Amino acid sequence: MRLWMYGLLVLLGVLLMVRRQAPSAYIVLDPGHGGRDPGAVAPDGTREADLNLAQALTLKEYLVALGYRVGFTRTSDVYVPLSERIAMARRMGARLFISVHHDTPTASRPGVYYSPHPGSEELARTVAAALGEGAWVRPSSASRFGRLYIDDFPGPAILVEFGPTRPISRAERIARAQAVASPIAEFARRWTA
């Protein structure tokens, strides 16, 4: 009887120690577009804004499971101005800013834009590698808009184009989240240590 109690106490001690050592970096996920701004729209009516939110919510589950605190710039179909997204992340005390997007319906590959701030390019390359062979990495200045709002975040910031805007199954969304969560968490651990 006493042996199982000893085992239970050891297990509880280990769990408490692991919990105390869990990462505490705050990561803000920014599901792009929303509300009056649908983003790209596929021929079947699939809206990029909806895909972005669903992908960000799924990614959060995996980052939280890895011990990270995660915030959002939006959690429903609302419009949030670009400048407010960065201001929200700053108010939340974010250490990393990850904008979640899907490209035009005709896009052929996923990719990642990165801000000019230290750590951003490394984070972008890490996430692009997790997205698979052929994923591109570009500075934010190379976007068709000339400059991206992620540049206004003072730390590592990326904009991930998870692929074309089209219907996406829950299984595919989960696979994408699983693929990028660990590399993001590993980067956050190193960056915030």
Regions found by a protein language model. Name each.
Residues 2-7, 13-26, 50-193:
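Active-site-proximal helix/loop segments of hydrolytic enzymes
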Residues 25-45:
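Short glycine-rich His-centered loop
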